[in-house]
Amino acid sequence: MKAISLGLISSIIFSIVLAKNSSGSGSSTGCFGCFRKKPKKKILATEVAKPVKAPETADFDPKLPNLKFIEEFEPITIEGCKSRLHELDEPFVSETDGMIIDKVTGFSRRENDSVLSGWYIRPYEEGYENMIKVNFIPLREYYKRMENRPPKQYDGPPPIPDMPQGYVPPKKEEIPVEQYVIQLSEEDPYLLQEEDALSLMEYDAETLNEGDAETLNEGDAETLNEYDAGTLNEEDAGTTNEAGEGTTNEEGEGAANEYDAETLNEYDADTLNEYDAGTLNEYDAGTLNEEEGSTTNEAGEGTSNEAGEGTANDDEELDEEVASIFDDDEHADDLSLLDYDENSNENQENVKKGNENEGEQKGNENEGEQKGKKKKAKEKSKKKVKNKPTMTTKKKKKKEKKKKKKEKEKKKEKKVKVEVIMDHFSEMEKMMNNKIKHWNK
């Protein structure tokens, strides 16, 4: 027992004192707090913590100092002064400027205000006295300064401003053109003579002589000589007689002579000559000779001479002439339309005379028989007329002539253009020859 150290004794005493301070009724378990039983707190799920409301009006407590209950913290913000302020030598940042407490987290944060960034100014350190001294001037000094100023002299009215003038654009400076004289060396003329000049002469001239000129001489010239000249001699020369001089014959008189007279001569006269005159000669004259002997001379012989023989001879000649007109173009120009008209007129007169004699002799007995026979003859004559050319063929010929004339005009224009081109190339050849001679010198 004597060997117990002071450290153990001091620690025991210290623990006893702490136990007394923690529990006012003393320690029941001894000096060590580790053997003390802690009471368990019962947590009820039904009980809910109620929010504590702060009193609206707090009564003054004499024990506490004069404190104000603050529900929400309102930071003090300093607005930036717009006037010129005195700057500090050292930078200073206020603790309250731009401070905001977040209601959710409870932390304070600072707003980013561009006006407050930089040097901060303490409002209580502004030197207003210095500003007053600078701006304030006493009255005496002010009057002294005004007296020392020289008086203003009247210089008259202000000068009249210049009148605006029209805009004159600046003139463009003409850049002088430097003229260079090119001196050809000994090799250049030689190259020009052999390469450039020969290439121009050989290529251009050959193309003209071989290509263009041959085509003109062989193709165009031959076609002009064969086609155009031939058409002039054969067609155009013929058309002058037919269309130029003979237009009156073809269109004016000739239309009646060729178309109307032909139809009369071919259709009416043929039918009369072949049918009526033939029937008179063969049938009627024979019947008259057999039945009535007295009428043989009037109807038989008379009609044979007037209608039969005359019409037969005339009709054969007319048929040959018409065939020559439509078939042979060469003999068509040699025929005279007047002879053709006279023959047609004679045939018509002979037919009329024969018809008059027949009407007087026969009377009403042979009219029915003649009508039936005439119908058959007309059908035959219509078949003949269909085989012969009509007016449509003539119109086609005229259209073809017009087309040929247009083609001639086009070819003539081509000739003129070709001649102009040939003249141009001939001038070019002359120029090249002159240049070659000059270079040779």
From Swiss-Prot:
Residue spans of biased composition, Basic and acidic residues class: 349-371
Residue span of region 2 X 9 AA tandem repeats: 353-370
The UniProt entry lists membrane topology as:
Peripheral membrane protein
Keyword list, A-Z: Cell membrane, Glycoprotein, Membrane, Phosphoprotein, Repeat, Signal
Query: In which residue ranges is the amino acid composition biased (Polar residues)?
Result: 294-306
Where, in residue numbers, are the sequence repeats? 186-193, 194-201, 202-209, 210-217, 218-225, 226-233, 234-241, 242-249, 250-257, 258-265, 266-273, 274-281, 282-289, 290-297, 298-305, 306-313, 353-360, 361-368
In terms of InterPro entries, this protein maps to: PCEMA1
Residues modified by glycosylation: 21, 112
State the remark under miscellaneous: Associated with the host red cell membrane throughout the entire erythrocytic cycle.
Q: What is this protein's name?
A: Acidic phosphoprotein
